[in-house]
UniProtKB/Swiss-Prot annotation:
Top-rank taxon, per record: Eukaryota
Gene Ontology annotations for the cellular component aspect, listed alphabetically: extracellular region
Protein name, UniProt field: Class II hydrophobin 1
Keywords associated with the record: Cell wall, Disulfide bond, Secreted, Signal
Gene designation: hfb1
Pfam families referenced in this protein's UniProt entry, alphabetically: Hydrophobin_2
Length: 97
């Protein structure tokens, strides 16, 4: 009986712990999931591929901030799937940008 009470106490404590913060410091500019990588890209081809992409130089907090940070380098704010070697496949315009 005591075992079940203690086990229930530990289970309740485990459930009450907050979830791990998995944010990347970039606010809600990109949707969670596939398109979760904020990138400042020089060019967007066919609305799908970002060329000469870089991670924003500072944390961004909303779409307007993301647009302004990317505009400093003449780039477009995009949310991409797989940024590799300065190229990003499957990009979409950032939320609110």
């Amino acid at each position: 009986m005591k075992f079940f009470a203690i086990a229930a106490l530990f289970a309740a404590a485990a459930v009450a712990q907050p979830l791990e913060d998995r944010s990347n410091g970039n606010g809600n500019v990109c949707p969670p999931g596939l398109f979760s990588n904020p990138q400042c890209c020089a060019t967007q081809v066919l609305g799908l591929i970002g060329l000469d992409c870089k991670v924003p130089s500072q944390n961004v907090y909303d779409g307007t901030d993301f647009r302004n940070v990317c505009a400093k380098t003449g780039a477009q704010p995009l949310c991409c799937v797989a940024p590799v070697a300065g190229q990003a496949l499957l990009c979409q315009t950032a939320v609110g940008a």
